[in-house]
Amino acid sequence: MGMMDGKVALISGGAEGIGGTAGQRFVEEGGSVMLGDIQLEKAQAHAASLGERAAAVELDVRNLDQWEAAVAATKEKFGKLTTLFNVAGISEPGPVDTVDLESWNRTIDINLHGTFNGCRVGLPAILESGEDGAIVNIGSMLAMRPGSQFAAYSASKAAVTALSKSLALHCAAQNYPVRVNTVHPGAIDTPMYQRYLAAYPGSHEEAVEVFNRNHPIKRVGLAREVADAMLWLASDASSFTTANDITVDGGGSYRE
């Protein structure tokens, strides 16, 4: 038996990176997944690689109608929804005084409003299942330790953290059997991280060496390490855990 036996997840940003790996791990542990992503063809290919207990749907998290359609597709395909992973997000650099306003609005819209939309539409569907459910939102170590060059991203992820706690307390007050928690990744080897390395003025190898040298455990994190924290929060093993934060950053938040 796997830790996700009988559970059904909808994952935003499910085509690749942390979301894609979370989908893979969810299926490996016995669950079923609907991979929602704006990159539909990539999500479909990933779902096909995972077998019969995976499917894909187009999902722009800014679009409430697409969220409604994604939840409906999940219920039609797998009969219910028990788990929501809000993973989709973007990160664009810029300090407060010079950040492009379109970039600011886009980051807040996708990272914060997208997560809100998922919670708003996903919660009633999870309650409808009649089973214990879980919502796991993706924050960032920059929600705890903001970066001066990432004003919009830091602010959006701090807001996601507060949103998660607010929803968790609401569910508890209403006796809803749904737990809500946040996972905060540090630097994780994903397409987003590779874009950071590509922007480094030196070579790729130099960028990796500089990062590893300055990191407490001398390496970048793996998407699976974040996904496994997400699965634990979605499993019955964490039944007394809600309104909490798990940071998966190899100690990066506290480096000297």
Where on the chain are the PLM-derived regions?
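Canonical Rossmann dinucleotide-binding motif of NAD(H)/NADP(H)-dependent dehydrogenases/reductases
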Residues: 3-34
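Active-site helix of classical SDR
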Residues: 119, 156, 164
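Short, small/polar-rich loop/turn modules that mediate ligand/substrate recognition or access, typified
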Residues: 177-179, 241-243
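Short C-terminal tail/terminal secondary-structure segment
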Residues: 3, 145, 230-231, 242-256
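Substrate-binding pocket helix/loop in short-chain dehydrogenase/reductase
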Residues: 95-96, 100-108, 207, 211
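Residue(s) in the substrate-gating loop at a strand-loop-helix junction
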Residues: 140
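Alpha-helical segment proximal to the catalytic Tyr-Lys
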Residues: 124, 169-173, 239
